[in-house]
Amino acid sequence: MPKVLLHDIEARRALARGVQKLAAAIESTLGPKGMNAMVDRPIGTPIVSRDGVTIASEIELPDRFENMGAQVVREVSMQTNEVAGDGTTTAMVLANGLIQGGVAALERGAKAVDLCKGIDRAVEVVVESLKSAAIPVSDRRTLQAVATIASTDSHLGDLIAEAVERVGKDGIISSDYGLTTSTTLEVVEGMSFDRGYISHHMVTDVEKMEVVLEQPYILLTDLKIKAPGELAAVRARVAETGKPLVIVAEEIAPEVVVTLLGEGNRGKVLVVNPPDYGHWRKAMMDDLAIITGGRVIARELGGMLEEASLADLGTARQVRASARETVIIRGGGDDAAIAARRQQVAKQHDLAPPNIEQDKLKERLAKLSGGTAVIFAGGVTPVEQKRTIQLIDDALSAARAAAEEGIVPGGGTALAQCAPVVVRALGNINGDLGEGIKLVRETLSRPAAFIARNAGHDAAKVVAELQSSRAGVGFDAANGVFIDMVSAGIVDPVRVTYTALRNAASVATLVLTTNTLVADVPEYVDPTQGPALGGGAEKLGRA
């Protein structure tokens, strides 16, 4: 197919126009008094949203070259959302400022490479300043504030803060479609895995179809249990204590199950299959052993069930099992051993490539942390529930980011107050490098300026007062006053703030160092061809 090309400054101008058009649709949504954007859909009612990534994902520009710029910046918002869960609009506001100012600098004769080096140096100074100023999160109130700002819903913020508080920042917290119109939280304490009882004849709670065993011993093995006699010795030892027995075994013969179910053993024994498959199963069994304080009677170590003693068995305060899931609550493992195992898995997770292996390690880390939570999204329609799930996921990412790396004053305050830091660190650098540094310094105040402008205030006055105020004092756009932002609960996770800036600088560097654009030649469609109504005459009439 024939191509059309655009070169040099005309190419960068086209990209900048596309970025500006996309940003114009996003910038007015920023802040507590930002306006909505309404997006038409081919079927159904329009989307009404103030979420930057939602709006950006719906925008395609008719000019192919301008659309390239819009799509590149849209990717910035999506990357920011994926990493930090929030800050999508801020990332696009920053990117637009850097790109428009950068293109203007290039037209004045600046060299793109030096300009971009200056941008990168200034950004890293700001990132280090933000990280060093981050305030650790130590209370539920702050987590709730972060989640509420990210989701724009105080109820969701409260549920997410409760979930993080109850299962920990490394615990499993997921979202799902609810069965009612209300959004609710369900928390399961302990380690859970997706394997249930192997026979419903083991059930102790008929109404819930669950097996609930109090203070059981837990036998873990990868051996194939072929005959009832293999378990006779260990069952006798457990029976002497008067406690029930949970067996987690890879394979157990039907005649063994029949023997276990007989003799009035309901409520005294539970058999479940081990979690996962392959080498992940072995790792999960080892995790279970550490959590419960037992050991895996393993084939490769020459283990024999007949020789198993009570010291080889794990314990727990309670074990609950349904047809699909087993939960071990308050395992009897040593706290120091569990912490060491968690640290080991966390290190493996950090070194693993971002694929299925990292996901599995993250799942193991969460299980070792001792809890799972599910937030069920309520709503009248599936569309409403889907939107709620998106908000939950974004707010959850933001809350976790805050718990892991801390918070900074929100409302654009932290970025705006980093401008003097850039001056002190890099103010003596001139030339094109200095031009890039100056560009970052001027762009840092843009989010605060748009928040003030969208609330009906004089952006220039607000920014000037903001940069002269003491650290942490920012502009509460909702009430039109300057206050201590952290005390007021107007905060952002530091990861959200520096990720937005880094991603904005990355895309700006890409645009400013682009010299050629290549696109397909638009195809001419003859309106008189095809089965259009009226033979195409209605199209000719519009033309």
UniProtKB/Swiss-Prot annotation:
CDD domains registered for this protein in UniProt: GroEL (cd03344)
Subcellular compartments: Cytoplasm
Keyword entries, A-Z: ATP-binding, Chaperone, Cytoplasm, Isomerase, Nucleotide-binding
Entry keyword Nucleotide-binding: yes
Gene Ontology CC annotation, any one: GroEL-GroES complex
Top-rank EC class of the record's enzyme: isomerase
Annotated ATP binding sites: 29-32, 86-90, 411, 476-478, 492
Molecular function as annotated in GO: ATP binding; ATP-dependent protein folding chaperone; isomerase activity; unfolded protein binding
Principal location listed in the UniProt entry: cytoplasm
Enzyme Commission number: 5.6.1.7
GO biological process, one term: response to heat
Catalytic reaction annotation: ATP + H2O + a folded polypeptide = ADP + phosphate + an unfolded polypeptide
Pfam families: Cpn60_TCP1 (PF00118)
Transmembrane segments: none
Assembly behavior: Forms a cylinder of 14 subunits composed of two heptameric rings stacked back-to-back. Interacts with the co-chaperonin GroES.
Protein family per UniProt: Belongs to the chaperonin (HSP60) family.
Physiological role: Together with its co-chaperonin GroES, plays an essential role in assisting protein folding. The GroEL-GroES system forms a nano-cage that allows encapsulation of the non-native substrate proteins and provides a physical environment optimized to promote and accelerate protein folding.
Stated name of the protein: Chaperonin GroEL 4
Species of origin: Bradyrhizobium diazoefficiens (strain JCM 10833 / BCRC 13528 / IAM 13628 / NBRC 14792 / USDA 110)
